[in-house]
């Protein structure tokens, strides 16, 4: 505290009135000796009496030493009931010094790590969490104790309870906690929420992390953990473009770039997920940026696959399966497959989505090169039935990816976008002016010819 003052539990800042350090130096060794002889209760009563004097005199250092000594003696004597009882008693004493309580709690936190008997450990954690509740000056210790408790609950199979306990912590508001530790806590909260399939809460918690933090040194492990959790979250949401961005962030991480196998797997996932993402301006821009990556040369099959989706030509699904199916789903010795199109329920769904992306690509190409086309011809080009083709076309029109009007009676699709009335009027006016100028010029030339003939 400023000017050597100590803060009491009620918030008052007080100065030390009497220095008891010499008395404490003398009494503590005597008490330790008596405690080892089994006279613990007598020692505690003596120390509590001394603690009252040091506390009243606002001697923070001496009070801290006494509080730490009491809990230490109880711990060494394995008097667990006495330990819990004294923690509660000492923290609630009238006008107790905050720094002294903080020192005692910090000492007890080391005992939590050392105790192996689970019921005793849980009781001590419970006592310490009760003592630290609502106290800002021991918020970090409370957070660490809560994390330990959540870990124990998870190990015992009660993941739901572990997630619930850890969610109590609003660590993003803990100014005294290091940024790195705060991020570790938030990532643990995300992991447990995903484990209990609480995706909405995971999404909310993920927003508490500013990704600029991962640009700092020694944050690569946390960065990879964060993006892997985000991939799991977006897999559930089916947001392929977001997954692609997460894999790009993983791919750009120096420790991934350092290992050929790892960056290749990450880049393969980037390519596959950007292809799986429905077409829009952002997806199109990302496809072209990924296409410019020189490292794609080292995974030629994936480079060629990406090129198919940037080339303004129709693709046949059967040809694509023949050329790339084995590589994408099973891989080869030189190029292992990713888990994107694995033989799982999710893998099969993504494989089906890839076929949908091929169909959508082909319809966009038709909209570019055709003004009108029959339904039968379009279905033939897409290798689909008429009904399936119409369903895909309708979906693209609804998403405003293309413009089309279907005459179902005639079986004709019109891709020509109707012109804006103002533009139409301007075009008509311009053409009319051009026509009148031509008529005027023609009339003038006829008159000129007549005059020449009359002179002759």
Curated annotation (Swiss-Prot):
Q: What is this protein called?
A: 26S proteasome non-ATPase regulatory subunit 12
Q: Does the keyword Ubl conjugation apply?
A: yes
Q: Which SUPFAM superfamilies does its entry note? A: Winged helix' DNA-binding domain
Carrying N6-acetyllysine, the residues are: 221, 368
What's one Pfam family the UniProt record gives for this protein? RPN5_C
Q: Does the keyword Zinc apply?
A: no
Task: Give the UniProt keywords, A-Z.
Answer: Acetylation, Isopeptide bond, Proteasome, Ubl conjugation
* Organism field: Bos taurus (Bovine)
Q: Where is this cross-link: Glycyl lysine isopeptide (Lys-Gly) (interchain with G-Cter in SUMO2)?
A: 92
Q: How does it assemble?
A: Component of the 19S proteasome regulatory particle complex. The 26S proteasome consists of a 20S core particle (CP) and two 19S regulatory subunits (RP). The regulatory particle is made of a lid composed of 9 subunits including PSMD12, a base containing 6 ATPases and few additional components. Interacts with ERCC6.
């Amino acid at each position: 505290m400023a000017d050597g003052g100590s803060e009491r539990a009620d918030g008052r800042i007080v100065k030390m009135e009497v220095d008891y350090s010499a008395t404490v130096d003398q009494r503590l060794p005597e008490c330790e000796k008596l405690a080892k002889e089994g006279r613990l209760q007598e020692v505690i009563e003596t120390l509590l009496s001394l603690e009252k004097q040091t506390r009243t005199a606002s001697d923070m250092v001496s009070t801290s030493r006494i509080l730490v000594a009491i809990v230490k003696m109880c711990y060494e004597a394995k008097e667990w009931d006495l330990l819990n009882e004294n923690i509660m008693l000492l923290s609630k004493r009238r006008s107790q010094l905050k720094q002294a309580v903080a020192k005692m709690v910090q000492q007890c936190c080391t005992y939590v790590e050392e105790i192996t008997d689970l019921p005793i450990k849980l009781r001590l954690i419970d006592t310490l969490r009760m003592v630290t509740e609502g106290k800002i000056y021991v918020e970090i210790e409370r957070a660490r104790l809560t994390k330990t408790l959540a870990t124990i609950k998870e190990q015992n199979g009660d993941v739901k309870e572990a997630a619930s306990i850890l969610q109590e912590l609003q660590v993003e508001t803990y100014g005294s906690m290091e940024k790195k530790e705060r991020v570790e806590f938030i990532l643990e909260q995300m992991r447990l929420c995903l484990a209990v399939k609480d995706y909405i809460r995971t999404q909310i918690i993920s927003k508490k992390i500013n990704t600029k933090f991962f640009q700092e040194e020694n944050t690569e492990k946390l960065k990879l953990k964060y993006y892997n959790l985000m991939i799991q979250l977006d897999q559930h949401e089916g947001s392929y473009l977001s997954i692609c961005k997460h894999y790009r962030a993983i791919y750009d991480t120096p420790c991934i770039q350092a290992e050929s196998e790892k960056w290749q797997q990450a880049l393969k996932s980037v390519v596959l997920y950007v292809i799986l993402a429905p077409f829009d301006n952002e997806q199109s821009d990302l496809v072209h940026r990924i296409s410019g990556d020189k490292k794609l040369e080292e995974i030629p099959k994936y480079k060629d696959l990406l090129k198919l989706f940037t080339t303004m030509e129709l693709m046949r699904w059967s040809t694509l399966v023949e050329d790339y199916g084995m590589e994408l789903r099973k891989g080869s010795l030189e190029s292992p497959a990713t888990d994107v199109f694995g033989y799982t329920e999710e893998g099969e769904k993504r494989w089906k989505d890839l076929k949908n992306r091929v169909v959508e690509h082909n319809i966009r190409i038709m909209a570019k090169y055709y003004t009108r086309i029959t339904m039968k011809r379009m279905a033939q080009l897409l290798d689909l039935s008429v009904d399936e083709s119409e369903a895909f076309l309708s979906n693209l029109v609804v998403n405003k990816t293309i413009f089309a009007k279907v005459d179902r009676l005639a079986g004709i699709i019109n891709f020509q976008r109707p012109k804006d009335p103002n533009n139409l009027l301007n075009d008509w006016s311009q053409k009319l002016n051009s026509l009148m100028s031509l008529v005027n010029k023609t009339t003038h030339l006829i008159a000129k010819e007549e005059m020449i003939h009359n002179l002759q």
